Every structure is written in C-alpha cells, then in structure tokens.
Regions:
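Short, Lys/Arg-enriched anionic-surface-contact patches
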Residues: 1-19
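Amphipathic alpha-helical segments within well-ordered protein domains
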Residues: 24, 48, 70-74
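Short alpha-helical "recognition helix" segments of helix-turn-helix
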Residues: 32-39, 47
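DNA major-groove recognition helix of helix-turn-helix
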Residues: 51-52
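Short Lys/Arg-enriched helix C-cap and helix-to-coil transition segments
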Residues: 57-74
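Helix-turn-helix/homeodomain-like alpha-helical modules used for DNA recognition
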Residues: 71-131
C-alpha cells in the first residue's frame, strides 16, 4: 500500500473532479467548450473528456460540493475567479473533513477515527505558541 498524503488526494483526485464539475455546470449555463477551457486553464480536449466522463472519474463529489460549485459558476468571469472559487471549495472539503472520506477511499488501512492531519497540526500550533 502506497502512502498518500491528503494533499496528494487533493492534487490527483479532488482538483480534477472539481474542475470537471465546473466544466459540467458551465456547459449547462450555455458556455462553449472553448470558453470553459480558457476559464479553467485546460485544453478543449480536457473539457471534452470531462463532459464525456473520460477524465476525473475516480471521485464522485458529494451533493453539497456540487451545490457549492453550481453557485460558484454564477460568479465566475475570469480564470482568477475560478482559482479563488476552487480554493474556497477545497478549504470547505478540509474544514468539513470530507477530505478524510476521500483519503480513506484511496488509502486502505487508515483507522476510522483518524485525526492525524488535524490533531497533529493543532497540537503543533499549540506547542509553538507556548514557546
């Protein structure tokens, strides 16, 4: 079993899945693939693969994430807007610990009550503050 850090889950699985959902939602709003590709900073071929379920299929995003993306697409006017919206969505995934759900899926053997990512960081910050 390969060790995967939560950040790797984000980079390899979550960011592509979130981009894919942005592409789907933007297409539903009537945007053309060329425009979607420009906004997301990917190729038109990547958008085609997202829309045809040939890319970013390893993760099915939770309904709450899809809902957030739907709302986000209405605010997006430029690539920098997409970056900001994706960062907010990733932060939400971390804050709500949905990242743990995805981490468990791709790395077997993690205890159900694992808190390493959150507990270690919190205890480390507290130790640093005490110095």
């Amino acid at each position: 079993m390969r060790l995967l850090y939560p950040q790797e889950i984000e980079v390899f699985y979550l960011i592509p899945a979130v981009r894919k959902e942005f592409a789907v939602q933007l297409k539903k709003q009537g945007k053309e693939q060329r425009e979607i590709a420009k906004l997301l900073g990917v190729t038109e071929a990547a958008i085609s693969q997202y829309l045809n379920e040939k890319r970013a299929t390893e993760i099915k995003l939770d309904r709450i994430i899809i809902s957030k993306i739907k709302k986000s697409t209405k605010k997006v006017k430029s690539p920098i807007d997409i970056v900001g919206e994706i960062q907010e969505i990733l932060a939400f995934i971390r804050q709500t610990r949905l990242i743990c759900k995805y981490h468990h899926r791709f790395m077997k053997g993690i205890p159900k009550d694992c808190y390493v990512c959150f507990g270690y960081v919190k205890s480390r910050i507290n130790k640093d503050r005490q110095k």
